[in-house]
């Protein structure tokens, strides 16, 4: 990374953490780590200029879907995948169950087959919403550079934490659309969230 603002900011954060860890914390055996996730999606995200919330808002209001970088490949994952990794890591840190020689940087991302292009995710969201022919317009931004490919190596988390992603990409899309549909129709999203958590935890 480092050729665009996004990846360079992540690399800078890791370097800063590493310098503090080796300078102040390593000798004290302090349980500390950094954790990075992929492109997290799921219900409850309404932030502006994010692919999934923007697509959902367009579908809900029956407006054209605009996408900026359709051929960019991203490591898509549901928020429950990310949180499960963070919780496992946190438990290991609290109980000091990690080998102190392991570098304390962790990636929690999807399996490689879940790394898909933006246009694939957008069309999948549209299909799951039930609007297969919804209009999409590509609106390229000239303001900044974006990497064509972002990915995460999750081998260490699998090996050292016995963590792995459990949801297929189809399930991730279904969970996401189901949550937003429930929200916009006034249904109990807390109950649905609990159902999704229960499904995930028993998968």
Model-predicted segments: where are they?
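Flexible, glycine-rich beta-alpha linker
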Residues: 1-5, 26-51, 73, 107
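Active-site Tyr-X1-5-Lys
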Residues: 2-33, 56-60
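Short, conserved glycine- and acidic-residue-centered signature motifs
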Residues: 9, 48, 150
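Short, contiguous clusters of charged residues that form electrostatic/catalytic patches at enzyme active sites
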Residues: 15, 53, 84-88
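C-terminal substrate-binding subdomain of Rossmann-fold SDR/epimerase-dehydratase oxidoreductases
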Residues: 59-203
């Amino acid at each position: 990374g480092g050729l665009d603002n996004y990846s360079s900011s992540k690399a800078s954060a890791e370097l800063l953490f590493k310098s503090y860890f080796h300078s102040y914390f390593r000798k004290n055996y302090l349980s500390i780590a950094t954790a990075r996730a992929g492109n997290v999606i799921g219900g409850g995200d309404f932030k502006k200029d994010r692919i999934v919330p923007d697509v959902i808002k367009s579908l809900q209001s029956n407006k054209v879907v605009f996408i900026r970088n359709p051929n960019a490949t991203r490591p898509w994952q549901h928020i429950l995948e990310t949180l499960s990794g963070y919780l496992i890591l946190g438990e290991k840190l609290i109980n000091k169950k990690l080998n102190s020689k392991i570098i304390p940087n962790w990636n929690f991302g999807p399996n490689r087959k879940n790394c898909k292009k933006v246009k694939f995710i957008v069309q999948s969201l549209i299909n799951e919403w039930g609007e297969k022919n919804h209009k999409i317009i590509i609106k390229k931004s000239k303001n900044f550079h974006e990497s064509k490919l972002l990915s995460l190596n999750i081998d260490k988390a699998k090996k050292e934490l016995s963590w792995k992603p459990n949801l297929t990409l189809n399930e991730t899309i279904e969970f996401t659309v189901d949550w937003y549909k429930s929200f916009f129709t006034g249904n109990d999203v807390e109950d649905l969230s609990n159902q999704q958590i229960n499904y995930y935890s028993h998968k």
